[in-house]
Amino acid sequence: MQVYDISQELFGSVVFPGNPVPAHRALKRMEDGQAANLSEISLCTHNGTHVDAPRHFVSDGRTIDRMDLNRLVGPCSVIAFEGLLTASDAARLISGRQQRILWKGDMAFGVDAAREFVRAGVLLVGVESQTVGTDDCRADVHRTCAAPVNLGGLEGAPCRAVLIRP
């Protein structure tokens, strides 16, 4: 089994305009005579690699702590695509694939493509503007784990996303 980390490093990740920049500071340092190192972080729930809960765009949607983790862990397909994904592109590319789709490349999709994902029973759509996976990780079917931090009542949370080649 090989595990590939597909997460962005949080403090070096691109920040959406207007969102706070993630930061950290040392509270305790062993080099200063403390018994342990201890840090404090501040971040937006949508900085870096993260999971959006339905609450992010639906006022009464489920919060991150109420999401079914089974949707975020399991077999997935990695599909390379560049540009704007249309509904017909989505239907063609996801046909016969796993229910979890990770898109590799600089891509975006609109409402019609999102509706096609729902119609096809897609459980997870992963997008990263830089890449999903690494150059040596080109096999089409993997397993993925993108479990979010359990932040009760919030609309999103950071996660450590990985691809697993059995």
What are these regions (language model features)?
Residues 1-166:
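Active-/binding-site microenvironments in catalytic and ligand-binding cores
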